[in-house]
Amino acid sequence: MGPKRRQLTFREKSRIIQEVEENPDLRKGEIARRFNIPPSTLSTILKNKRAILASERKYGVASTCRKTNKLSPYDKLEGLLIAWFQQIRAAGLPVKGIILKEKALRIAEELGMDDFTASNGWLDRFRRRHGVVSCSGVARARARNAAPRTPAAPASPAAVPSEGSGGSTTGWRAREEQPPSVAEGYASQDVFSATETSLWYDFLPDQAAGLCGGDGRPRQATQRLSVLLCANADGSEKLPPLVAGKSAKPRAGQAGLPCDYTANSKGGVTTQALAKYLKALDTRMAAESRRVLLLAGRLAAQSLDTSGLRHVQLAFFPPGTVHPLERGVVQQVKGHYRQAMLLKAMAALEGQDPSGLQLGLTEALHFVAAAWQAVEPSDIAACFREAGFGGGPNATITTSLKSEGEEEEEEEEEEEEEEGEGEEEEEEGEEEEEEGGEGEELGEEEEVEEEGDVDSDEEEEEDEESSSEGLEAEDWAQGVVEAGGSFGAYGAQEEAQCPTLHFLEGGEDSDSDSEEEDDEEEDDEDEDDDDDEEDGDEVPVPSFGEAMAYFAMVKRYLTSFPIDDRVQSHILHLEHDLVHVTRKNHARQAGVRGLGHQS
């Protein structure tokens, strides 16, 4: 059995050609065995020698991984991107994968490529096509970050003050299955939620996924910030972030900062910093003559003194509860922060300024404040609604908080109900199929009963049944008028032939046939018995107007969903084909019937 076939790179093919030229007396079969390739492959390589050497010179370093001359669908974009990448690397500056993707998106926007998304798959193929490889140090850092992490255990119930422990603090014990509805009676603009998150301010989120030039160094504790975010339920008020870190206060001083900053040895929000923050909030609410509720999560509340709070009531989430701001708001803030870092890094790379790649504490605080302001109030209100609170102006909270376990139980109950409904629908569908089968058998032996002879009970069942996607039979009947577009026009042209639309069941005939057609069928039965037998075997075919009206409803249903241009184009092509085929078949059917009557 010969060697297994494999696709060689241009660099490997070039080495084979070089080996043949350096050893002219060596048999070709021996060279093929030396490189573990079939003799036919060697012959093909030597035949295309000139093209292979030209491709190796063209791709340079990329020839070590490039195997074909097949161009990427974004060849022009990649050409500009690799030229930019080589220019930056020649200056000795590192280019990370996320920066490369952001630059590709900018180039695509300039070229008008709206379908380009700079996905991770494209980035991987781009690297292989152009020989951009990952460094070993970066790969090790990626492996560390990809390792599964054990989720942190929830805070001990003992750390949460119990109800009635003094001050304006309200606590919930872990043993309580249903937490009290402390937010009930408050307007949505008077219900605030605060949560604390960590931010590695001098690193991109995918630091380990950089390209050659990244050092993959471990993160330092001094580069981590703790950020406290606080907003109300309708998103109309976003309090300035409280940021804590290990580094001393910036030289600009607290007055020149866009948010409050505090430094301590642990780098977290301490009890003293939180008490000062709440005192300032209480003073502000007193000036506005408001009483608000603040729902807190992972805060330093073990020894928090709230006796001086008069206009702020503090309550704590029970263990295992997903806080409103952690349902997407925190992720948005980090995303906006990353975008600001990307813009700064790209400006430094294009200006070939290595010092611009470093981010100072003062600039990081400005980025945090800008990222917080970039969050839309509607997104904050949506997260509160998802957490079980009302959202929107002047809304009153009437629902209680739900833990993760309770939400999972509710989702399981809903899934069980949906499964039960699905089983009932399947049973009903099987019964309808059996009834339809019986109707077909009866249709072969005798005429189908008229609609007026149907029992009243069956009529009620048919009225109650709806189509598979919630479309009633009456909606289908109105398709000629309501669907719009070209199908509506075609259906209107045949409205006289199909005044009312009905579904065709089993062996039922179409009720839209006119009385003249019934008279013609009776005349055919009297004139020719053979024609009667043939007509009895014919499957009822909807008229042209009926077909157009049916598809008009299908089109209206499909276009009721958000669809892209490609799907819209498919629907338009299908419309054109259906009109053409239906007209052709309708004309052919009319001609066949005319010939039958003449005979």
Swiss-Prot record:
PROSITE patterns: HTH_CENPB (PS51253), HTH_PSQ (PS50960). Poly-ADP-ribosylated by PARP1. N-terminally methylated by METTL11A/NTM1. Alpha-N-methylation is stimulated in response to extracellular stimuli, including increased cell density and heat shock, and seems to facilitate binding to CENP-B boxes. Chromatin-bound CENP-B is primarily trimethylated. Keywords: ADP-ribosylation, Centromere, Chromosome, DNA-binding, Isopeptide bond, Methylation, Nucleus, Phosphoprotein, Ubl conjugation. Residues 536-599 are annotated as: Homodimerization. GO terms for molecular function: centromeric DNA binding; chromatin binding; DNA binding; satellite DNA binding; sequence-specific DNA binding. Its main location: nucleus. The modification N-methylglycine is found at G2. It is found in: Nucleus; Chromosome, Centromere. Residues 65-136 form the HTH CENPB-type domain. The modification Phosphothreonine is found at T396, T398. Residues 143-184, 387-475, 495-544 are annotated as: Disordered. Residues 2-52 form the HTH psq-type domain. GO terms for cellular component: chromosome; chromosome, centromeric region; condensed chromosome, centromeric region; nuclear body; nucleoplasm; nucleus; pericentric heterochromatin. Antiparallel homodimer. Interacts with CENPT. Identified in a centromere complex containing histones H2A, H2B and H4, and at least CENPA, CENPB, CENPC, CENPT, CENPN, HJURP, SUPT16H, SSRP1 and RSF1. Interacts with centromeric heterochromatin in chromosomes and binds to a specific 17 bp subset of alphoid satellite DNA, called the CENP-B box. May organize arrays of centromere satellite DNA into a higher-order structure which then directs centromere formation and kinetochore assembly in mammalian chromosomes. This is Major centromere autoantigen B. It comes from Homo sapiens (Human). The lineage of its organism: Eukaryota, Metazoa, Chordata, Craniata, Vertebrata. The gene is CENPB.
